[in-house]
UniProtKB/Swiss-Prot annotation:
InterPro entries: AB_hydrolase_fold (IPR029058), Peptidase_S10 (IPR001563), Ser_caboxypep_ser_AS (IPR018202)
Gene that encodes it: KEX1
Organism annotation: Komagataella phaffii (strain GS115 / ATCC 20864) (Yeast)
Protein name as catalogued: Pheromone-processing carboxypeptidase KEX1
Known catalytic reactions: Preferential release of a C-terminal arginine or lysine residue
Transmembrane regions listed in the UniProt entry: 513-533
């Protein structure tokens, strides 16, 4: 009787789906072009296909979300990561086939193994969302981030009905760029659902945390950082004839932000006048004498060039091969898609509908999330559109868990990968921030093995090291074929033996002892329930991923603005308190010989100015 109860437990935990989703075998991906060339250890177990949502808040809904799930063969991971790309309207197949998935696509449109795949550390599920993105389809395009979040919760309910064992894995939500809006909204919706007596999700779901890369979380801070970024990276001539126009646009953006009341009914995700700063900067810095494909700075990686006005829209360079791969009939069939299905990286229609006239920027809900779960924000330092300056200034001003920003005495810690300093990390009160060196808007695209180190930091899978008298942390280096982990090159190898799989589809793994192992698994599952309760209550308090010994105590807190600090010697700009940002801009204006019609000063946010403010979707895809 006990045996029967244990076997039925995963099914009881997930509420019945009103839709016939079939079985896991119906979604199994058995072959792909080039897969036979990979070693057995490099071939993941894969499931993919469309899940119908039947959204309750949409009449006659026909929305279907496409997912692609990867896990290591014969290995039962304790963690599962759901990954979302941004846009809005950009497919998560970017993440699956150009960033952190187990494959990259070669010029023959065949899969090759991705040496740094996150699938070595966790199961990973890539989801095209909202409807109309990538392979996902709909005739009912969503208009608010709250709707996007509710739609994803419905998708998860369908998914966990199909994969009930995944409910008991530690759930992490990850994404990049515009997913900086998606992820916080979805996290909030998941939390609300789990607390509701009528929620769609199983109560056993353990929400571990989130990772957001180059996130477009605070559009205002990002917009105000563009000009500073161009100046600091010497991408622009501060004495150029176009500078007064750029400064005027910066001032207009600042005034719009200052006049915003901050109330949900009047807030907007972004202002077109603020987005115009980046567009103008790219236009003014165009090199018309250069070859056509070198005339514009790549907004996703300032070290690269592109045609104008694309300015990075034709990047990454592997995109044509990915597109051709996903249009192959054999691939569509393997992914359980109709032969007439079409794929494009980004959908303008999704972005044009997602107006967010009611939804507030996700930075406003970030503090509440940080009370519940740890979140890692990471930024590649070559990105312009969602640059590290904007993210760091957002954190400086963010009030969370009893304080503003990271407190004085909380220091950046150097991060080493394979004895190379690849970034710096700071962590406190459930928030961790990582600046990743020599990386673009898509950090995993530039160096996937290093990006997996972000997951190791998130999993507390690192150790304290010292290289050349510099103390820091080091993340593992993985040897895939031998399934061995290195903490650093001087430490002995740590053997990670394969574990039995938790999936209920024996054909997926070809394990002849599967059913015996499964019986053992469900028994262990009951014990894990006790562990879950312990983790839930022990992790409820905000904490720092980094050890306390990296933090220096200080009685006094003093916050300085780093705005234009590289120019201080030339422009005679003093470090200024956060509350006086505008006075710093005023000094910059004066140093350029530019005088505004009115003094540039902070405006009363409560002032009822009659402003013609109109929000539109990003003119450039955030991928």
């Amino acid at each position: 009787m006990l045996k029967l109860l244990c076997l039925l437990l995963p099914l009881v935990a997930v509420s019945a789906s009103p839709i016939d989703l079939g079985s896991q075998k119906d979604y199994l991906v058995l072959d792909l072009p080039g897969l036979s060339h990979l070693s057995e250890t490099q071939r993941p177990t894969m499931h993919a296909g469309l899940l119908p949502l039947n959204l309750s808040f949409v009449a006659d809904d026909d929305t279907e979300y496409f997912f692609w799930r990867f896990s290591k063969q014969d290995v039962d991971r304790a963690d599962i990561v759901f990954w979302l790309n941004g846009g809005p309207g950009c497919s998560s197949m970017d993440g699956a086939l150009m960033e952190l998935g187990p494959f990259v696509i070669n010029p023959k449109q065949e899969v090759e193994y991705n040496e740094g795949t996150w699938v070595e550390a966790a199961d990973v599920v890539f989801v095209d969302q909202p409807g109309g993105t990538g392979f996902s389809s709909t005739t009912n395009y969503l208009t608010e981030l709250t709707e996007v979040a509710d739609g994803f919760v419905t998708f998860l309910a369908r998914y966990f009905h199909l994969f009930p064992a995944d409910v008991y894995k530690k759930f992490t939500l990850g994404g990049e760029s515009y997913a900086g809006q998606y992820v916080p909204y979805i996290l909030k919706a998941i939390m609300d659902d789990l607390k509701s007596d009528s929620g769609q999700l199983p109560k056993e779901l353990y929400l571990k945390g989130a990772l957001i890369g180059n996130g477009w979380i605070d559009p205002n801070e990002q917009s105000l950082s563009y000009l500073e970024f161009f100046i600091k990276k010497e991408l622009i001539d501060i004495h150029g004839s176009y500078m007064p126009g750029l400064l005027q646009q910066q001032e207009k953006c600042q005034n719009l932000i200052n006049h915003s009341s901050g109330e949900a009914s009047e807030s907007q995700i972004s202002y077109s006048a603020c987005e115009k700063i980046l567009n103008d900067a790219l236009r003014f810095t165009r090199d018309k004498k250069a070859p056509l494909d070198q005339q514009c700075i790549n907004m996703y990686d300032y070290t690269l060039r592109d045609t104008y006005p694309s300015c990075g829209m034709s990047w990454p360079p592997y995109l044509p091969d990915v597109t051709a791969f996903l249009q192959k009939k054999s691939v569509l069939e393997a992914l359980h898609l109709d032969s007439s299905a079409s794929w494009s990286e980004c959908s303008a229609r999704v972005g044009s509908h997602l107006k967010n006239k009611i939804s507030v920027p996700s930075v406003d809900i970030l503090p509440d999330l940080l009370q519940e779960i740890p979140i890692i924000l990471f930024n590649g330092d070559h990105d312009i559109i969602c640059n590290c300056i904007g993210t760091e200034r957002m954190i400086d001003k963010l009030e969370f868990n009893g304080d503003q920003g990271f407190t004085e005495g909380t220091e950046y810690i150097p991060w080493f990968y394979n004895e190379v300093n690849v970034g710096k990390v700071i962590s406190e009160r459930n928030l961790t921030y990582v600046r990743v060196y020599n990386s673009s808007h898509m950090v995993p695209f530039d160096n996937t093995p290093v990006s997996r180190g972000l997951l190791d930091i998130y999993f507390d899978n690192f150790e304290d090291v010292e290289y050349n008298n510099v103390s820091g942390i080091a993340t593992p280096v993985y040897d895939v074929d031998k399934n061995i982990t290195y903490i650093d090159s001087n430490d002995p190898r740590l053997q990670n033996g394969p574990k039995s799989s938790s999936t209920d589809d024996s054909a997926a793994h070809g394990n002849p002892f599967f059913y015996y192992v499964f019986e053992l698994f469900v028994i262990v599952l009951l014990l894990c329930g006790l562990v879950y309760l312990y983790q839930y209550y022990s992790n409820s308090a905000p904490h720092s991923i980094l050890a306390d010994k990296h933090k220096k105590k200080s009685k006094n807190k003093s916050k300085n603005v780093r705005f234009l600090d590289d120019l201080e010697s030339n422009l005679d700009l003093d470090n200024t308190d956060d509350k006086k940002d505008n006075s710093v801009m005023s000094k910059l204006l004066s140093s350029m010989g530019y005088q505004a019609q009115e003094p540039y000063k902070p405006l009363d946010k409560g002032a009822n100015a009659d402003l013609d403010i109109e929000m539109d979707s990003h003119g450039t895809s955030e991928k």
